[in-house]
Amino acid sequence: MGKDKKYFLDEKPEKLTYGGVFRRINDWARARSLWVVAYGTGCGSIELRPTFTSRFDAERLGMRMVATPRQADVLIISGYLTVKTLKRVIRVYEQMQSPKYVVALGACPINGGMYYDSYNAINRLDLYLPVDVWITGCMPRPEAILAGFKRLQELIDSGRADGWKKYIDNLDRYRENQKKIIKNWKMPNYNW
Amino acid sequence: MEVLNRLREKFEITGDKVQRDDLALVETTGKDLIPVLVYLKTYEGFKTLVMISCVDWMEKGKFQLSYNLWNPEKKKNIIVKIFLDRENPVFQTIYKIWPQAEVYEREIHEMFGVNFEGNPTQDEELILEDWEEIPPMRRDFNTLRYSMEKFGEREPKSGIIIRKQISEQYDEWRRK
Amino acid sequence: MSKEEVRLFIGPQHPGVTGNMSVEVLLRGDTITWARTHIGYLHRGFEKLMERKIFIKSFPLVCRICVPEPDTNEENFARGLEELAGIEIPERAKWIRTLVLELSRLQMFIMWYGGIAGSMGLSTPVQWGIGDRDYILDLFEELTGGRIYHIYIMPGGVRKDLPEGFEERVLKVMDMVERRLPEYDEIIMENAVVQKRLKGLAKIPKEWVDEMGLTGPVARACGFPYDVRKDHPYEAYPHLDFDVITEDGCDAWSMLLVRRREIDLSIDLIRQIIEKMPRGEFLAPLPNVLYWKIPPGETYVKSESTRGEYGFYVVTDGSDKPRRVHVNGPSFVHGITLLERLLVGQNIADVAPIMVSLQTCPPEMER
């Protein structure tokens, strides 16, 4: 890992274009196999465990946890995001392959929740990442999470979950917002 | 607790209080703190350092450092505290007495800006990353204002307007 | 770092670490030669936020400090405020609090029991552990209205009395959990892989316990009978009959045995509590909590969580807000000072079992 290696996107990637019946088939298939990157960014990850194990069993809906972002379709922002985590989350998000979807869990990514006055937790997630589905609650129950995923599946199936396209189109604007709170874009040498 | 009498005989103790049967508070001077800690560890059986904490007394211009020790045999806690000048808070490290003190001091250095001379890792970032303001746990750091300036409004302008309309409608409805 | 060594970063986005934290290690072959814990990914500044909120408004915040086991925080903070304000709480409230604490310990232990197996690649106990924990979460939901965050314990007692017939339902769940445990034992304890990997893993030198301030199951696995419930009895624990569990192996296997026996102990304690619980008031009369001022003072209260001694250092200055609240979780020492020293010389594949054995909980390290 060289010192000037690029950790983040610096130009717009090529947008994937496909249409017609292939798009329809792709969307149908994608909606039925959502792989979630296993990154518990906040306290919401405690309710993801029941969701993905025996009692609520999200695997029957085609969802499972995967370890690496390169295989994943969905990034769950589980609860509040601190500035330090936001940097990692952006990096994880940019490593994921399109099409990719973001689900925001809990009240904190919406408007800061109970950490609205905290110096280290962001207030609004949609300034920094495009969000496809919001699930409210603190914490959202597993039923609510499943309902949110159901909604995400509907959106994907009908071709309306296009947050990743928005991110590519408005990369400059998102990057400007991100740069407001992340001053140093070099990853520290203890993780990259 | 009897240990307080012995401490009073040997060291300069500026105040003490028995808070509970198993918890005593002792106040001493910065000069005597390390002898007190070593004495408590070697002779009185307070072998374990539970925590180091810092309190900001901004009005008095002081930082309070509290060293919390535990005696595993007699099951007693003792909190030894000292006051530092707030303008130039410097103190010695005690990580050679207890290894875990290193991380506690590193956290206090980051959160309050107290300097611990001789601590090898205190300048490494522990919790915050690229922090540019005054240390955040100081009383004069306004976290709400910082949050508003850095992270923006909690909701978009349209949301505030809608909320205002709703509350006005609600007020009207209540007046009826 | 020499040329033969490789720097490896475990976390924060890694399924093996216990939450959102990261460990940086240097590797020589498969062996770790140096380790450093990095935290701060979950730092929300609780202690700062509590300084600008009145006492009662801090309670929704305080339970979020440790996510899997929130009740210890509430109970500690409430007990600290009661001590400083000089409030005596009714006898029944103490017993209900003890019941809630034990239930929350039990659910955490059951999840942990599955988790330690999961860290070694056995995924069946993970499913069982989290599934069986849900029965206890259902009890919590009935009692407090929330599955994870309860905000049930408040200064002066508890928010509501037990619902009718709650005791029987608790006992029923206890019977169910007890019936399930032999199956767990069969799949975890008698598993050759678990035995081979955990026996002798992460051996802690005995002198580290007092020197570093190790507590809870980690200290008890080294043969030190440190248990806050026995040493500094709080709430209803003085009236309960139990022995401190110790093992003498100092390794991850002993920690597993200690926690396994703690499950039995928790079930036994819950039965004792329900049997001995007195009737009466559950909330002491409080002043108007919106204008509640507590005289100046400072105290340190502690209780036994699943990970060890959990302490709250509360300083008040006579106003309606706390001057300083310092939360001292056991993971702060276990996860940084101990883990950094313990990983040296271990195999890279054993990082996850060691972290789960120490039960490091990042949100309580950085608050």
Q: Over which residues does each language-model region extend?
A:
Chain B
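Terminal low-complexity/charged segments
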Residues: 1-176
